[in-house]
Amino acid sequence: MTTGTVRRLPVENGVSGWEAISQRPFPLKKLESVVSADWLVIGAGFAGLSAARRLQALRPGEKIVLVDAGEIGKGTSGRNSGFMIDVPHNLSASEYSSGGAEATRVEMAQNRFAIAFAKDAAQDYGMSRETFDPAGKTNAAATGRGMKLNANFGQSLKAAGEKHLFLDAQEMRELTGSSYYLGGLYTPGTVLIQPADYVRQFAAGLSDKIDIFECSPVTSLTRKDGRWIASSPSGSVNATKVILGVNGHIDDFGHFGGRLMHIFAYASMTAGFPAGEFGSSVSGRDRWALLPADAMGATIRKITTNGVSRIVIRTKYTYEMKVAVGEHRMARMKEEHRRSLDARFPELAQIGFEHSWAGRLCLSRNHAPAFGEVEEGLFSACCENGLGTVKSTLAGIMAADLATGTTSPELSRYMDHPQPSRIPPEPFAWLGINGVIRLQELRAGREG
């Protein structure tokens, strides 16, 4: 008998703007009884949803249950900036791609495999262009160093035979309405999603074939007589096999302890403003998406729906030992967002932020996922390393394949990675990681 009490449960830090403007497409159902299943997936984010879809395809006659601690769309998966990126995106360094041409090709092949899976789901579940938009993204540079980083990234893409386009300052102004940027690097393969709508519509598409229980936190996970029992306050699920799609919370389930870095990213969304003459004159085209040339800079998106535009900005990171962020920290980050936005779009100074929030990333020192069969019949699809939209989608698919004994070249390549490296013990990890973050943010300068 294996017994495990879940140490901590997820916490929602602020209301995500993406969730606030999202609409729920199916009724919420809580776990309030004892349920038996062949498969249990814990976590209804990118990994869990993808694992459930893959399991349904591989084992259509078997019962699959998906549970989440909160309401789908309100958790971490509905709080990111909505970039499904096909090209390298390594947040552990200031340069997105630090590997050679072959490593770049392998990473892009994996990313595109995941994006193709997501595209099939989007089509099957009737997602609109506003929810799933293959529009590409631009790495924006506001400094000479940023321009050099873009040039280096462009060389990496060229060596791998990848399409890309450099934009000058005037072209960036035409795109964004801002004279802040010196140039940009456009890559066409990124898909832009409305993250809260994406996970909600994905879940809605699955809901007629699998049982989905929300607001049903798993407080303990016990193995007895060859089956796993997941207990929740008002019910339980027993299943032969379990897939954990809980990202950084995997260490709260007793696995990969001392190996994962829990990074908080902070974001704000403006109130809506008219998308007509005013909106276009001060913020360019109706929809665009910018990543910073330096990974520690500001990620910015403009979205427009029904004649109303909004800008979403994400910048600043902290490493935390707790799952909750204090009000003082949230208020300070909102002020940082205001300064960054005003520097780029001074004409929007009177447009306030409607929502500010934080979301957790999970990174490992060696950029390796927390993946594999961690106990008999218990599989981990965790640690997205800063690109959960794609990496967690991929991990969920691969976990389903591994758990069902399905062989594929993709799984063989994915399994060819080390375990996440150990991080220093606390408080040294907190001091060291936050120190590195601060230094990298200072170096990013106007990119932030």
Identify what each model region corresponds to.
Residues 128-139, 171-201, 316:
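Helix-loop-beta segment of a Rossmann-like dinucleotide-binding subdomain
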Residues 56-79:
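Glycine-rich FAD pyrophosphate-binding loop
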Residues 106-112, 140-149, 185-204, 213, ...:
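Short beta-strand to alpha-helix junction loop
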Residues 116, 124-132, 218-220, 236-276, ...:
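Active-site substrate-recognition segment that forms the wall
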Residues 1-39, 57-58, 62:
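Extreme N-terminal leader/targeting segments of oxidoreductases
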Residues 155, 180-240:
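Helical element adjacent to the flavin cofactor pocket in flavoenzyme catalytic cores
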Residues 87-169:
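Dinucleotide-binding Rossmann-like beta1-alpha1 core, especially the glycine-rich loop
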Residues 318-439:
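C-terminal catalytic lobe of FAD-dependent flavoproteins
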